[in-house]
Amino acid sequence: MSVSRRVIHHGLYFAVLGPLIGVLFLVLYIFFAKEPLVLLVIIQVLPLFLLLSITTGAIPALLTCVMVACLPEKIGSQKNYRCLAGGIGGVVITEIYCAVIVHIKGMASSELFENILSGDSLVVRIIPALLAGVVMSRIITRLPGLDISCPETDSLS
């Protein structure tokens, strides 16, 4: 499969599922690390929480998918190396993205958004990015749409 086809396939899944997986792990982290009552507050504002996670997580997830799709065959074909690269890439790309957003200050106009992007909430950004990168890198080859036949190349062989 060509790199461009892998980028498109991975991009759709990473951008949609990546932030949602991150939210799932973040909610579990808050439930077990903090008081469970905090989870009730999050459930009350879950639509805003999901929107915030997608706005802060879709672009890093998309960039992580491009990185995973462009891995050399030797690394990309082995699950463990692909998961390691996806997890590290997810963390690094998310931190770079958040640093750029904080410096631009264009998107960080609200107090809630600014608190999430501040250095105080490093764990809140790193854990979901790491786990979403690992999980998505692990399951991306099993998701439908990867083995799409192309009529132009099928007729040549």
From Swiss-Prot:
Bilayer topology annotation: Multi-pass membrane protein
Membrane-spanning residues: 12-32, 37-57, 84-104, 116-136
Ranges of the Periplasmic topological domain: 33-36, 105-115
Recorded superkingdom: Bacteria
Keyword Transmembrane helix: yes
Family, per entry: Belongs to the CbrB family.
The protein, known as: Inner membrane protein CbrB
Chain's gene name: cbrB
